[in-house]
Amino acid sequence: GIDKDNEYSLYDVLINEEDFEKVIVSTKTKNLTVCPSNISLAGAEVELVSMMSREQRLKEQLLKIKDQFDYIFIDCPPSLGLVTLNSFTASDSVLIPVQCEYFALEGLGQLMNTINLVKKHLNKEIKIEGAVLTMYDIRTNLANQVVKEVKKYFQDKVYKQVIPRNVKLSEAPSYGMPIVEYDARSKGAKAYDKLAKEFLKKNEEEAKAKHLK
């Protein structure tokens, strides 16, 4: 895990324009660093409203450091507020996790509308990276119905690897550990390992195809 009492967090980057170098912390995992956030980020939604270029603040800071990394993943809150808009404006693509539950489908339309608006007004380069099915339980008809609907909606952009419901995945955060450290042999850890490999392969193939054009 990482120290939850860090002096700086993502809030300071967005609101106080602190450099990412002050916020980024190392982890036990090789080549993995993290920019933590905390409860103060919720207050950023209100403070951003009155700021100039409020949707661009994260992008402006990320441009200073992006060449230091192969990939930068932004874990967005479930709401479509200004923090999420900042994330979309700063991103090359969006990877959408979809829980295999009924209400997950309800929010997909609104999410896609928001991404389309961002593409039109704030970030014309943004694209859908893909959709990842999570909390999948093969025993339920509902989960299988959600899979069917998501594949119908996103077609070939749905990742083949699904993330199953798994007790170990639920337990790991409470111990401040990633699943690969908490229980690398669990179904959840193996699923995420396969998903990561599928993601890398997909991106490498796309980069190769782009280079050949």
Predicted regions and their residues:
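P-loop NTP-binding core
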Residues: 1-213
